[in-house]
């Protein structure tokens, strides 16, 4: 079954997601017990994202050796990027690990780009002089978010927006 959560940022954490699915506030649970033994409705539960299940299906179909042959020496397989922001063709893109930021920008139709935020608001901001860097564990690991900012954007305002986002989305357990 596929369930749609409430959409809160904290619900990306597995136990907060389970709380949300149970109709409660999406707050992380104390552990132990872990979801694998006491998860959704106190039943054994596995929580994975769609990308993991998609990769597992391809591995089951084509074999682990095939999958390991995609990507780089230290980052096997593919990565799904959710590309958004100042580009002509936002959307979901799947690349072999090792793709450069410049390649992604070309594919999504980004022009006059000053920066890319990789891995969402808690990730890193990469400036234009670093667009040769690669999406891979050995260079820029990512959770999949890829936000494009062109020259019209005030990067101070972008940073301020991220700070407001975290203030609003905080679950209240982390201290400043």
Residue ranges and their predicted role:
Residues 13, 127-129, 160:
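Short, well-ordered secondary-structure micro-motifs
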Residues 9-11, 114-124, 164-176:
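Local cysteine-cluster metal-coordination motifs and their immediate loop/turn environment
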Residues 99-104:
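Short, structural beta-strand-to-alpha-helix junction motif
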Residues 1, 111-135, 142-144:
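Terminal amphipathic helices with adjacent charged low-complexity linkers/tails
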Residues 20-32, 129-143:
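Active-site loop ensemble at the mouth of alpha/beta enzyme cores that anchors a bound cofactor
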Residues 77, 89, 112, 142-143, ...:
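A generic structural signal for well-ordered coil/turn residues at beta-strand boundaries
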